Amino acid sequence: VSAEDPTTSTLAIDCGGGGIKATVLDDAGTMRAQPVRVPTPYPLTTKLFIKTLVDLSKKLPQATHATVGLPGMIRHGVVVATPHYVTVRGPRTRIDPALVEQWNGFDARTALRDALGIPVIVLNDAEVHGAGVIAGKGLELVLTLGTGLGCALFDGGHLAPHLEVSQAPVRWGLSYDTYIGEHERRRLGDSLWS
């Protein structure tokens, strides 16, 4: 983007437990490119995560900044905890303590800003999705269903502190992710799920 062209564009990346999707949006929120998707690679080190997102960005038009949604608890672009990326082979597999140590406290915003060379915002994935659908009036709760359950709360259009409910227990030994996530949808089938 040249100095004479005030157009801004956003590299929008949705990082899920099963896939990582990206596209570029103009300042009105309209897609400027067809979305691209890759399966989430496991085991997913922070280094492989950054490489995967950079590789995806190279398949899309250049953007002036990026917004990245990650599963889990994210504070100021830093990963507090993530449920899927700390597992050996993805959701519902064994947790790797070395990955937990690597991800917890990982400054994703700074790492992505340095790798992409543009300003980056990193939020919880449900918060990013919610920002695109809320009316901006009153108290709004956004729930997303994907690999697991995502949750975002907005008050008067402002994002409230994140409440991570995906790993909360529903029944003895069952989290919300396990109870109503993608694995359960596949088990029940679309006709029962709807």
Per-range role (PLM):
Residues T10-D14, H65-T67, E140-T144, G150:
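Short glycine-aspartate micro-motif
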Residues G138-L141, G148-V170:
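Anionic-ligand binding region
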Residues W193-S194:
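A short, acidic, amphipathic alpha-helical segment used as a generic capping/interface helix at domain edges
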Residues P41, T46-V54, K58, H65, ...:
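Glycine-rich phosphate-binding loop and adjoining helix at the ATP-binding site
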Residues P6-T8, G117-I118, G136-E140, T147-L149:
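Short coil/turn connectors at secondary-structure junctions
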Residues S2-K51, T93-R94, H158-R186:
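Short glycine-rich, Thr/Ser-proximal phosphate-binding strand/loop in the N-terminal lobe
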Residues C15-G16, L70-P71, N124-A126, L145-T147:
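Fold-independent oxyanion-binding glycine-rich loops
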Residues I20-V24, G72, L149-D155:
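Short beta-strand scaffold segments in enzyme catalytic cores
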